[in-house]
Amino acid sequence: MDDLLEELTADIDANAAISFAVTDLESVIESDGASDHADQPPDEGATQRYTDTPLTDDAVATMDGWLDNDQLHTISDAIVTEHIDEILLLLITVRDGACGKELLQDLRRLFGADLSPGTVYPHLNDLAVEGVLEVQKLSKRKVYRLSDPEGAFTRIDHMVDQLLLFSLVLKAVMTDCKARQSQSQGRETND
């Protein structure tokens, strides 16, 4: 027995990475080892599989400096929720398609936002109903992709322009108020 183990160990590449998720094991256990795609030709089942993936190096490079940024983590969940549609569209673009679980993880990593699936999924469904997103329904999840990237970018660009204008106006009004308050206090001390 020991000789057999040594022989098997010698055949195994120690540097090989073996990866699986608990859900993979659970689905095998529940199905008694039967394939979900046993009734399909081999290639058809392969196109319907989707594996959760971390952000690619290209995606991380796109968002470099933004991920796990302490300053972005100060943005409240309420503000993230208010602009969730545009944020989701950008995250889906960066990933070139994503499932809801990945988007929730990205929101947490980008903004420190602890949003529930009950907050995010209705927005994804609404965007799909509006035709902004295409949905690929798989056995255990949905994968969302932009149906019209240019239209989505136009929508996001418009929203960002409005936010910038709104922020600039608020900043200008606040600066005026502070200046008037300061002048008012200066006159009171001179009197």
Curated annotation (Swiss-Prot):
What is this protein's name?
Transcriptional activator GvpE1
Question: What is one term from the GO cellular component aspect held by the record?
Answer: cytoplasm
What's the subunit arrangement here? Interacts with GvpD.
What species is given as this protein's source?
Answer: Halobacterium salinarum (strain ATCC 700922 / JCM 11081 / NRC-1)
Q: Which UniProt keywords apply?
A: Cytoplasm, DNA-binding, Plasmid
Chain spans, region Disordered: 31-51
Upper lineage: Archaea, Methanobacteriati, Methanobacteriota, Stenosarchaea group, Halobacteria
Q: Which gene encodes it?
A: gvpE11
Transmembrane intervals: none
* Binding residues for DNA: K140, R141, K142, V143, Y144, R145
* Keyword DNA-binding recorded: yes
Region: Leucine-zipper; residue ranges are 150-181
Compartments reported by the entry: Cytoplasm
